[in-house]
C-alpha cells in the first residue's frame, strides 16, 4: 500500500503527526508512507524511520493557487498512491490528493471539504480533546473510533532518532565544552511574548544552574535571538562564559541534535518543546494562556507548570514587556525544583 500524508506547517504539529505515521506503520507494516510538507520540515521527517520520502510542498502556507495545486497533484499520479491523509483543516490542503486521483482521501471535515475528501470525519472536540488523538484517529475506520477512549493504548508517541556520533560532532562544531553537562532553554514562542516565560526568570534560573556546574544553551529561531541576548545580558562575566545563545545560529537539524545532547530542557509552549519530548529529554514545560489540555508534551519525562486553568485567547500579555501574568508568577525556584527532581529521576 502506498500512502501520501499532507503534513502540517508548524514544528509542534509536525512532531505530533509522527504518531499517525507510527500507527499507520504498525497497522500496515508493508505500507510506504510519503509526507508532503514545507521543505523546512525535512530535517524532522528524515529522523522518522516510518517516513519513506519527504516531498517538499512548494506553495506557501497562505496561497490558494488552484492551478499550481492541480499541476502538483497531476505530477504525483505516476506514484499511484492508494490512500491520502490530510492533516491541515484548510480547503486548499485537500486539493493535491484530489488532483492526484488518490482513491481513498481521509481527513477531518475542516473547511467543508466534502468531495475533495471521500472519507470525511466530523470533529467532536470533546470526544477528541488532544491534537495527537485527532491525528491518530484517522488511521482507523470512522465507524470504529467514536471517541478517544476507543483508541488502542498506549498511543505511539513521537520518537526522533539521533546518534551519539552526531551529538559529539555538532557539539564540537559549535565549540560547546564537554566539561559541563548542558541544560537547554527554549525561550521563544509563536505570537510574541504572551506565551513566554519572562527573560529575567530564565536569566535567574541560568545563574543558579551555572553556579551548580551546568552550562546553559539557548535554542530558537532568529526571532528569538534578542530574547536570548536579554538572558545573556543579565548574567555576570563569569556566568556568561557558560551560557551560549544559539537562537537563530543553528539549522533546525543542528538544533535537534544539540537538544538531544542536553541533560534536560526548560521550555515555553513551542515547537521545540515537542522536539525535546520526541527526543525523550527530561523537560519542564511552562504554560500560560495556551493550554496543555490540547497539545501537551508527549513524554513521560515532561513536567508541566501552569498556574491557571482553561484556554485564554491572549496574544498580548499584561506586563509592559508583553508577558502574561500567569507566566510571570511562575518562579525560577519552582522551575529549578521540578528540574532537579527530573534530573534525580534520570540518574536513578
What are these regions (language model features)?
Residues 1-348:
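Catalytic machinery of carbohydrate-active enzymes
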Amino acid at each position: 500500500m502506498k500512502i501520501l500524508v499532507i503534513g502540517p506547517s508548524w514544528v509542534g504539529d509536525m512532531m505530533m503527526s509522527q504518531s499517525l505515521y507510527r500507527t499507520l506503520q504498525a497497522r500496515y507494516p508493508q505500507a510506504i508512507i510519503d509526507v508532503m510538507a514545507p521543505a523546512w520540515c525535512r530535517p524532522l521527517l528524515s529522523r522518522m524511520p516510518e517516513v519513506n520520502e519527504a516531498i517538499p510542498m512548494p506553495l506557501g502556507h497562505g496561497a490558494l493557487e488552484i492551478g499550481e495545486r492541480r499541476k502538483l497533484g497531476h505530477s504525483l499520479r505516476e506514484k499511484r498512491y492508494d490512500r491520502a491523509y490530510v492533516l491541515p483543516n484548510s480547503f486548499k490542503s485537500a486539493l493535491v490528493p484530489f488532483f492526484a486521483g488518490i482513491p481513498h482521501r481521509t481527513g477531518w471535515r475542516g473547511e467543508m471539504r466534502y468531495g475533495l475528501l471521500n472519507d470525511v470525519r466530523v470533529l467532536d472536540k470533546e470526544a477528541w480533546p488532544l491534537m495527537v488523538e485527532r491525528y491518530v484517529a484517522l488511521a482507523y475506520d470512522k465507524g470504529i473510533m467514536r471517541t478517544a477512549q476507543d483508541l488502542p493504548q498506549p498511543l505511539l508517541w513521537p520518537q526522533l532518532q539521533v546518534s551519539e556520533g552526531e551529538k559529539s560532532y555538532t557539539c564540537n562544531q559549535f565549540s560547546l565544552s564537554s566539561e559541563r553537562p548542558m541544560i537547554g532553554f527554549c525561550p521563544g514562542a509563536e505570537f510574541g511574548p504572551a506565551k513566554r516565560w519572562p527573560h529575567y526568570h530564565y536569566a535567574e534560573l541560568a545563574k543558579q544552574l551555572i553556579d551548580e556546574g551546568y552550562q546553559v544553551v539557548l535554542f530558537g529561531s532568529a526571532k528569538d535571538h534578542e530574547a536570548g541576548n536579554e538572558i545573556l545580558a543579565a548574567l555576570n562575566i563569569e556566568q556568561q562564559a557558560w551560557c551560549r545563545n544559539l537562537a537563530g545560529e543553528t539549522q533546525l537539524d543542528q538544533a535537534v541534535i544539540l537538544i538531544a545532547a542536553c541533560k534536560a530542557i526548560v521550555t515555553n509552549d513551542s515547537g521545540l518543546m515537542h522536539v525535546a519530548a520526541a527526543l525523550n529529554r527530561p523537560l519542564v514545560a511552562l504554560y500560560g494562556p495556551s493550554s496543555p489540555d490540547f497539545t501537551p508534551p508527549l513524554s513521560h519525562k515532561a513536567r508541566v507548570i501552569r498556574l491557571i486553568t482553561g484556554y485564554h485567547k491572549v496574544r498580548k500579555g499584561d506586563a509592559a514587556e508583553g508577558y502574561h501574568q500567569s507566566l510571570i508568577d511562575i518562579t525560577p525556584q519552582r522551575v529549578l525544583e521540578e528540574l532537579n527532581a527530573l534530573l534525580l529521576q534520570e540518574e536513578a
